[in-house]
Regions:
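Acidic, metal/ion-coordinating pockets
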Residues: 4, 11-139
Length: 139
C-alpha cells in the first residue's frame, strides 16, 4: 500500500463519522547537535518533553497528524548534521505530542546505513508509533 492510499483510507474513515476532517502535516523533525546537547541529561538519558509543548494542542486537536522524521533513530553515537542520528526518546516524544504517523522516506533515511534503517523501523514499532516510507527488507 502506498503512503497516499494509506492516508486516503485514514481520512475517508474520519469523514464517514463527521463529514469533515482536520489534518496536520509537519516536518522536518530532525536533531541538530545543539538540540541533542540541550536534551541530554547528566545520567545520559534524553528529555524532549518540552520540545513540542507550544504546538502540541494544535497537533492533538487534529483528526490526523503526520510528520516527516528526517533522522534515523539509532543507538549510541547520536549526531546532528550532516549524518543525523537521534535517540529513541525523540521518536517517543513525537508520538506523545500527538503525531499519528511518521514518514521515514527522505534523504537522511540511510545516514546510519542499512543497520540504522532497520533499527529505526524496530524502534518505531516497539514504541507503537505508526510509520510509513521505509521497511527493513524489500518484501
Amino acid at each position: 500500500m502506498t503512503l497516499f492510499s494509506t492516508l486516503l483510507i485514514s481520512v475517508a474513515s474520519l469523514l464517514l463519522g463527521s463529514g469533515h476532517a482536520t489534518l496536520v502535516f509537519a516536518g522536518d523533525a530532525m536533531q541538530h547537535q545543539s538540540q541533542l546537547d540541550n536534551a541530554r541529561r547528566p545520567d545520559g538519558s534524553f528529555d524532549y518533553s518540552h520540545y513540542f509543548s507550544a504546538i502540541e494542542p494544535y497537533i492533538k486537536s487534529a483528526d490526523y497528524a503526520v510528520v516527516n522524521l528526517e533522522t534515523p533513530i539509532g543507538q549510541k553515537g547520536y549526531s546532528g548534521y550532516p549524518m543525523f542520528c537521534a535517540p529513541a526518546a525523540y521518536a517517543k516524544v513525537l508520538g506523545d505530542a500527538g503525531f499519528d504517523m511518521l514518514l521515514t522516506a527522505n534523504n537522511h533515511t540511510l545516514d546510519r546505513r542499512d543497520r540504522g534503517l532497520r533499527h529505526t523501523y524496530a524502534i518505531l514499532d516497539s514504541l507503537g508509533v505508526d510509520h510509513i516510507g521505509t521497511y527493513p527488507s524489500p518484501a
